[in-house]
UniProtKB/Swiss-Prot annotation:
SUPFAM superfamilies: Nucleotidylyl transferase (SSF52374), Ribokinase-like (SSF53613). Residues 1-330 are annotated as: Ribokinase. This is Bifunctional protein HldE. Keywords: ATP-binding, Carbohydrate metabolism, Kinase, Multifunctional enzyme, Nucleotide-binding, Nucleotidyltransferase, Transferase. Residues 356-490 are annotated as: Cytidylyltransferase. ATP binds at N205, R206, K207, E208. The gene is hldE. Homodimer. It comes from Geobacter metallireducens (strain ATCC 53774 / DSM 7210 / GS-15).
C-alpha cells in the first residue's frame, strides 16, 4: 500500500464501530531484577521494582482498536469480583462501551501474573475460570448483538478457551453477522474449527493450524494443504496463518495464496501479538481494504508488537514508521512526543540503534553541525530534543532565543544527520529520555558524565553516554559578540 492509502485508512478509523467478543482478563506484570538465589530453595529471587496491571485477552484487542482510533464496544462475561470491576473501570476510562459485558457472581475473572526480569518472563501465575458460560449469558450477549448490531462495521472474536465463546454463542453471533453482512474476524483456539463455521477470516498461528488441520507443516506444500483444509472446514472467505519469523500466509476461498515475508526484528515478548494482528485485520476489512493489503499491514504491526514487552498496543504512527516510507520534506521529521514515541518503538523493532541529544541550537553554526554529525555516527537514528522558546528564556535569559522554536526546528530538520526533532518545554530533557529510552545519549564535551541529565536512566537498561568535543571558538555567544562588535555602533 502507498503511504497516502495507509494514512487514509487510519484517518477513517474514527468512523469505524468495532465489536469485540471474547474472553476478558487482566494481565499483571511484576518487573524487577533477578540477581540472587533463594536460601530456601534453588529458585531465583525477584527484587520487584515496578508493578503494572493491563487489560488482556480479548480486552487487548479492544485496546489495540482504541489505539488505532476506532470506536469500540465489548461483549463478554466477567466475574462479580474485584478483577471484574477493575476491568470495567479500565474500559470506561478508555471510552470503550461495556454495555455488552455481563457479570456472573459465580465466575472468576481471569488474572494472569507475569514475573519479568531483564525483559524476559520468569514465571506466569494464572487465576481464572474455564467453565462455559450458562445459556442465560449466551442469550444476553446475542440479545445485545441483535439490538445493537446495526451500528457495527466489524466483529472481532478473540477466543482464549476460557468459557465465554461456547459453540452455541459462536454459531448465533456468526449467523447474525452474516444476516447483516458484517465481517467476522476470529483469533481461534482449540482444534475444532467447525465452531467458527461461516466466519469471514481466521488467524491461527502455525502450531494452531497444524493441530486444527491435522497436517504437520514442514514445507510450502504441506502449508498449503493445511490452509485449504481449514478454509473448507470452517467455510471461510479467507485464512491467515501467522508463521513467526517466516511472516504470514494468506489463503483465499478462490484458491489464491499470498506469502508475506517478515522483516528482521528483535523479539522480546510474543504476548498479545495475535491481538494486534486481529485488530489491524478487523480495521482494514471494515474500511474495505483487500485481504492481501490487510494481511500486509497486520504483518508489519505484529513485528512491532513482538518488539515490546507484555500486552501492548500498536499505533498508526508505528505502523507507518515501520513501512519504510521516506520523509517527504524536513517538516515530516518534526514530531510531538506522543507521535515520536510510537515511531521510535517501530525503529527499535526494526533493529535500529537510537541516539538522543538535546540543546537550544540558537543560531546554528559549524560547531553545531559537526557535533550533530558525530552524534549520528553512534547509531542509526538521531533524535534531537529542542528546547522551546520558553525553556531557552529560562536558561539563557529574556533576550534569547534569537530564532523562534518553529524556525529552529525546521532548520535542524533540514540536516541529513537528524532523523527526528521533538520540542520540549521543560528545563531538562529527562521526560523525553525516559519515554524514548535511547541506546546512546550524547552531550557536549563541556559536561562531565556525572552531570549529564538522563545518564542514570540510560545506563539502567544498558545504554551509554558519549561526550563530544566542540569545535574551538565556535558558539552562538561568540557569533552574537562578533555581530555586536561589527554593527553595535550603527
Amino acid at each position: 500500500m502507498e503511504r497516502k492509502n495507509v494514512e487514509s485508512l487510519f484517518a477513517h478509523a474514527r468512523d469505524i464501530n468495532a465489536l469485540v467478543i471474547g474472553d476478558l482478563m487482566l494481565d499483571e506484570y511484576l518487573w524487577g531484577r533477578a540477581e540472587r538465589i533463594s536460601p530456601e530453595a534453588p529458585v531465583q529471587v525477584l527484587d520487584v521494582t515496578r508493578e503494572e496491571v493491563r487489560i488482556g485477552g480479548a480486552g487487548n484487542v479492544a485496546n489495540n482498536l482504541v489505539a488505532l482510533g476506532c470506536r469500540v464496544s465489548v461483549a463478554s462475561v466477567v466475574g462479580g469480583d474485584e478483577n471484574g470491576t477493575i476491568l470495567l473501570h479500565a474500559f470506561s476510562g478508555k471510552g470503550v462501551d461495556v454495555s455488552g459485558v455481563f457479570e456472573d457472581p459465580q465466575r472468576t475473572t481471569s488474572r494472569k501474573t507475569r514475573v519479568v526480569a531483564a525483559n524476559q518472563q520468569i514465571v506466569r501465575i494464572d487465576r481464572e475460570s474455564r467453565d462455559p458460560i450458562g445459556a442465560g449469558y449466551e442469550e444476553k450477549i446475542v440479545g445485545f448483538l441483535r439490538e445493537q448490531g446495526s451500528r457495527f462495521n466489524v466483529i472481532l472474536i478473540s477466543d482464549y478457551l476460557k468459557g465465554v465463546l461456547t459453540p452455541t454463542l459462536l454459531a448465533a453471533v456468526i449467523a447474525v453477522a452474516r444476516e447483516r453482512k458484517i465481517p467476522v474476524v476470529v483469533d481461534p483456539k482449540g482444534n475444532d474449527y467447525t465452531k467458527y463455521r461461516g466466519a469471514t477470516l481466521l488467524t491461527p498461528n502455525r502450531k494452531e493450524a497444524e493441530a486444527a488441520s491435522g497436517i504437520a507443516i514442514r514445507d510450502e506444500a504441506s502449508l498449503c494443504r493445511a490452509g485449504e483444509r481449514l478454509l473448507a472446514t470452517a467455510d471461510l472467505t479467507a485464512l491467515v496463518i501467522t508463521r513467526s519469523e517466516e511472516g504470514m500466509s494468506l489463503f483465499l476461498r478462490d484458491g489464491g495464496v499470498v506469502h508475506i515475508p517478515t522483516f528482521a526484528r528483535e523479539v522480546f515478548d510474543v504476548t498479545g501479538a495475535g491481538d494486534t494482528v486481529l485488530a489491524i485485520l478487523g480495521l482494514a476489512l471494515a474500511c474495505g481494504v483487500g485481504f492481501a493489503d490487510a494481511a500486509g499491514l497486520a504483518n508489519v504491526a505484529a513485528g512491532i508488537a513482538v518488539g515490546k514487552v507484555g500486552t501492548s498496543t500498536v499505533s498508526p504512527a508505528e505502523v507507518i514508521g515501520s513501512m519504510g516510507f521516506q520523509h517527504s520534506d524536513s517538516d515530516a521529521k518534526i514530531k510531538n512526543l506522543d507521535g515520536l514515541a510510537g515511531i521510535i518503538e517501530a525503529e527499535k523493532a526494526r533493529g535500529k540503534k537510537i541516539v538522543f541529544t538535546n540543546g537550544c541550537f540558537d543560531l546554528l553554526h559549524v560547531g553545531h553541525v559537526k557535533y550533530l554529525q558525530k552524534a549520528k555516527s553512534y547509531g542509526d537514528v538521531l533524535v534531537l530534543g529542542l528546547n522551546s522558546d520558553a525553556s531557552v528564556r529560562r536558561l539563557k535569559g529574556e533576550k534569547r532565543p534569537l530564532i523562534d522554536e518553529a524556525e529552529r526546528a525546521h532548520i535542524l530538520a533540514a540536516l541529513d544527520c537528524i532523523d527526528y526533532v521533538v520540542i520540549f518545554d521543560e528545563d531538562t530533557p529527562l521526560r523525553l529520555i525516559e519515554t524514548l529510552k535511547p541506546a546512546v545519549l550524547v552531550k557536549g564535551g563541556d559536561y562531565t558524565p556525572e552531570g549529564v541529565v538522563g545518564k542514570d536512566v540510560v545506563e539502567s537498561y544498558g545504554g551509554r553516554v558519549e561526550l563530544v568535543t566542540f569545535v574551538d571558538g565556535r558558539s552562538t555567544t561568540n557569533i552574537i559578540d562578533k555581530i555586536l562588535r561589527a554593527y553595535g555602533e550603527e
